[in-house]
UniProtKB/Swiss-Prot annotation:
One of its GO terms (biological process) is synaptic vesicle lumen acidification. It is a peripheral membrane protein. Keywords: Cell membrane, Hydrogen ion transport, Ion transport, Membrane, Transport. This is V-type proton ATPase subunit G. The lineage of its organism: Eukaryota, Metazoa, Ecdysozoa, Arthropoda, Hexapoda. It holds the Pfam family V-ATPase_G. GO terms for cellular component: apical plasma membrane; presynapse; vacuolar proton-transporting V-type ATPase, V1 domain. Residues 35-44 have a biased composition (Basic and acidic residues). PANTHER family: V-TYPE PROTON ATPASE SUBUNIT G (PTHR12713:SF11), VACUOLAR ATP SYNTHASE SUBUNIT G (PTHR12713).
Length: 117
């Protein structure tokens, strides 16, 4: 009987060591996965930053700076407003004359649906 309990003790100890080894292996695997995930996130972040930098270079090269674009838009807007003001000055009298003629020249007529009863 003593040999059986000794054998059982050895089996239990071996099972305990195996469980510890499995536990350690799981911990190492989890640690490796966490490290791989962090490395992947770092790599993605570096790639994103590089693409952002390339885009900003492209944008600056092809579109100019925001201040430059804003100044260009302001200049174009001023030119168009000046052109519209000139058109108003040249057409103002003719438009007023046409509007007044339409207001003063009233030609009363019966509506087409009106029926004398």
């Amino acid at each position: 009987m003593a040999s059986q309990t000794h054998g059982i003790q050895q089996l239990l100890a071996a099972e305990k060591r195996a469980a510890e080894k499995v536990s350690e292996a799981r911990k190492r695997k989890a640690k490796r996965l966490k490290q791989a995930k962090e490395e992947a996130q770092d790599e993605v972040e570096k790639y994103r930053q590089e693409r952002e930098r390339q885009f900003k270079e492209f944008e600056a090269k092809h579109m100019g700076t925001r201040e430059g674009v804003a100044a260009k838009i302001d200049a174009e807007t001023r030119i168009k407003i000046d052109e519209m003001n000139k058109m108003v000055q040249t057409q103002k009298e003719a438009v007023i004359k046409d509007v007044l003629n339409l207001v003063y020249d009233i030609k009363p007529e019966l509506h087409i649906n009106y029926r004398v009863v």
